[in-house]
Design a protein with these regions (language model features):
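C-terminal transmembrane helical hairpin of 12-TM major facilitator-type secondary transporters
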Residues: 274-284, 289-344
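Conserved MFS/SLC helix-loop-helix module at the cytosolic interface between two early adjacent transmembrane helices
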Residues: 62-101, 291, 297
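Extracytoplasmic gate region of multi-pass secondary transporters
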Residues: 31-35, 230-282
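Cytoplasmic helix-loop-helix junction between adjacent transmembrane helices
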Residues: 106-144
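Paired small-residue
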Residues: 86, 90, 101-109, 321-329
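Residue-level signature of mid-helix packing/kink "hotspots" within the transmembrane helices
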Residues: 29, 57-65, 150, 277-285, ...
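Helix-loop-helix hairpin linking two adjacent transmembrane segments in secondary transporters
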Residues: 140-195
């Protein structure tokens, strides 16, 4: 590639950004703002709504692990494209829900599409960028979560207002259709590895580049076993678990707390959620850069500390000031841990196995996510308040902070 010419890696990273907008922004984060209207439309209680979240995360967990390995073996392009098609179709079908069983099934399948698209997308920074720029590149991809959240927070309340009682159905239809359009764009432009374009990763020169393994995309079972045989990768997964368990309680019941418990309007909740999305669009870049400078361990610990404070503020300061303070703190830190964990996975297992490594540690993240909504919904039902679930989320986040401090630096 000539000096001054845009490296194709930046185009790939932008495709990763679009992928996370659809996969996480529409497939997961939109549920938070649609949840109150969906509750009224289907007459579900909070335990059922929490279980819908759990079903989504079980699907996510299943394909995050398998999808990471499939991307390492067969290529990121085909895996992400098929996953986005599945996600788009099931989002549309969610709008047809009439029963809990059907809604649970659709949220489960949406989760599968989310996991299979999101994990390979988050590993793109490790494949296309040198280690010294890996956190920054991964942060750009994770910015799609915030952008998708912002779009959902602005768009969904308008759809709900326009279509009344059935508005939540149209919200799913529109989000699903948009995801299918994104699938087509990503298929056209994304590439799995730099060698497909005759390039080295961004930030790597020919004199610095060691002889790579053969260019073929296939990864053997022996190489896969080396990923889950590393104790340091298991510990990385444990650190990631605390994020999955804590943040999802806050995310799932964010709008329901404001609307159902605090008596605020759907528009207010949507506006505050849009603020979270807007701020979080750039938080991955910020925290990826911080982890490039401070190291993954200290970067993760600092991020967990800020996240924990945001949950406690939301639970204890029940005023508009508290709600905005919590939203700002969370928005500026929301996707910090996924960004740092994705970069760390690449640090530990290398670029070719980055998707597989991230998929493996996502097992722990997904277990936390599967437990969080059900526990949060149960605690809200028995206490008739969201205060206890948010306090629990804060305590779990602080535990993640402590665990992060013992994360070992990978050997060069």
């Amino acid at each position: 590639m000539r000096e001054g010419k845009l490296h194709y890696g930046w185009i790939v990273i932008f495709m990763g950004l679009l992928t996370t907008i659809a996969a996480h922004g529409f497939g997961r984060m939109a549920y938070t703002i649609i949840l109150p209207a969906m509750k009224d439309g289907l007459k579900f209680d909070y335990t059922q709504l929490g279980l819908l979240g759990t079903g989504n995360f079980i699907g996510y967990l299943t394909m995050a692990i398998i999808g990471g390995f499939l991307a390492a073996r067969f290529g990121t392009r085909i895996v992400i494209t098929l996953a986005l098609i599945l996600l788009g179709i099931t989002l549309i079908l969610t709008g047809l829900a009439q029963s809990f069983g059907y809604a649970f099934t659709m949220r489960f399948l949406t989760g599968m599409g989310n996991g299979a698209a999101y994990v390979p997308a988050m590993a793109l920074g490790s494949v296309w960028f040198a280690m010294k720029r890996r956190g920054f590149a991964t942060g750009i991809v994770s910015g799609g979560i915030g952008a998708g959240t912002l779009i959902s927070g602005l768009l969904v309340p308008l759809i709900l207002a326009a279509y009344g009682h059935e508005g939540w159905r149209y919200a799913w239809y529109i989000l699903g259709g948009t995801a299918l359009v994104i699938a087509g764009i990503v298929f056209a432009l994304i590439r799995s590895r730099p060698d497909e374009k005759g390039l080295l990763p961004v930030g790597v020169s020919e004199k610095d580049s060691p002889p790579p393994s053969p260019a073929g995309p296939k990864v053997s079972s022996l190489q896969w076993s080396s990923v889950y045989g590393m104790p340091s990768v298991w510990y990385l997964g444990l650190v990631y678990f605390f994020y999955g368990f804590s943040y999802i309680i806050y995310m799932t019941f964010f709008a329901a707390y404001l609307v159902k418990e605090m008596g605020l309007t759907q528009a207010y909740a949507g506006g505050l959620w849009a603020l979270v999305g807007g701020l979080s669009t750039f938080c991955g870049i910020i925290w990826g850069h911080i982890s490039d400078r401070l190291g993954r361990s200290r970067g993760a610990a600092l991020a967990y500390f800020v996240l924990g404070l945001s949950y406690l503020v939301y639970a204890l300061i029940k005023t508009e000031f508290g709600f905005y303070l919590s939203a700002i703190m969370f928005g500026l830190t929301a996707w910090s841990i996924p960004t740092i964990m994705a970069a760390a996975a690449g640090d530990f297992v290398g670029p070719r196995l980055a998707s597989a490594g991230l998929g493996f540690i996502t097992l722990f993240f997904g277990i936390g996510q599967a437990l969080g909504p059900a526990l949060g919904g149960y605690l809200a039902d028995i206490s008739r308040s969201f205060t206890v679930p948010f306090l629990v989320a804060g305590g779990i986040s602080f535990a993640g902070m402590v665990a992060s401090l013992f994360l070992k630096k990978p050997q060069a």
